Amino acid sequence: MNSDVSSSEHELSQDGSSQNNPSENFVSSSNSNESVNQVELSDNPEVEHQVKNDSVDTAKEQSSTSCESNIKGSDTEARLQQLEKEHETLNSQYMRIAADFDNFRKRQTRDQDDLKIQLTCTTLSEILPIVDNFERARQQLNPEGEEAQALHRSYQGLYKQLVEVLKNLGVAPMRVVDQAFDPSLHEAVMREPSDEKAEDIVIEELQRGYHLNGRVLRHALVKVSMGPGPKAVNEEIPDQSASNQELSESVDGPTKDEN
C-alpha cells in the first residue's frame, strides 16, 4: 500500500514539473525540431543545395541593393552640384539684367530731364526778348500827366507779373559789371581802353544774361576793358540797347520820379 502511494506521488511530481516549466518543454521541442531538420537536410542533398542557393541569392540581392543605393547617392550628389552651378549662372544673369535695367531707367530719367530743360530753355529764350523790350520802354518812357502815369503803372504791373513767372521757373539774371570776363557766361561785343578798369574786366552790360537753375540760359552781351591805353574807336554796337539795372530792381516798380 505504501509503495503504491509513493509511486503515485512520484508520477504527480513529474507531471507537475512538466507543467510548471513550459519553456523547457519549448526549448527541448525546438532542439528536437532542429535536429530533425538537420537529419532531413543531411538525408536530402537536393534540399540542402537549394537552401545554400537561396542563401547565396539573398546575399547577392543585399549586395546589389547596397550598390544601387551607392550609385543613386552619387548621382544625387552630382545632380545637386549641377543644379547649384545652374543656380549661380542664372543668378549672375539676373544680377546683370537688373543692373542693366537700372542703368537704362536712370538714363531714361536723365534724358527726359534734359529734354524737359531743353524745351524750357527754348520757350524761355523766346520770351526773354519781350522782357528786354519792357526794360527798354521803362528806360525811355518819361510819363508826364496823370493819364500817362496811370498807363505807365499798368505797363509796370504786366512787367512785374512776367518777371515773377520767370523767377518761379528758376530764371535769374546775371551780374556781370566789374566781373572778370568769362567766355562761358559772357559774349564780348566791344573792347575799349579804360583807365579805371583793369584788362578783361566787364565795363558795361549791353544785354542782360540769364541763368536757368544754374545753367546758362542766355549769355550776357558785354563791353570789356582793354586796360589803360590810348582811346580806341568803339566797335559796332548791337541793335539791342543795354539794360543797366538788374531784373530784381525792375520788379520793385518805377522810381519816385517816374511816378
Curated annotation (Swiss-Prot):
Homodimer. Its main location: cytoplasm. It comes from Prochlorococcus marinus (strain NATL1A). Disulfide bonds: none annotated. It is found in: Cytoplasm. Belongs to the GrpE family. This is Protein GrpE. The lineage of its organism: Bacteria, Bacillati, Cyanobacteriota, Cyanophyceae, Synechococcales. Keywords: Chaperone, Cytoplasm, Stress response. Residues 61-73 have a biased composition (Polar residues). Residues 46-60 have a biased composition (Basic and acidic residues). GO terms for cellular component: cytoplasm. Gene3D superfamilies: 3.90.20.20, Head domain of nucleotide exchange factor GrpE. GO terms for biological process: protein folding. Participates actively in the response to hyperosmotic and heat shock by preventing the aggregation of stress-denatured proteins, in association with DnaK and GrpE. It is the nucleotide exchange factor for DnaK and may function as a thermosensor. Unfolded proteins bind initially to DnaJ; upon interaction with the DnaJ-bound protein, DnaK hydrolyzes its bound ATP, resulting in the formation of a stable complex. GrpE releases ADP from DnaK; ATP binding to DnaK triggers the release of the substrate protein, thus completing the reaction cycle. PROSITE patterns: GRPE. Residues 20-40 have a biased composition (Low complexity). GO terms for molecular function: adenyl-nucleotide exchange factor activity; protein homodimerization activity; protein-folding chaperone binding; unfolded protein binding. It holds the Pfam family GrpE. It comes from the Bacteria.
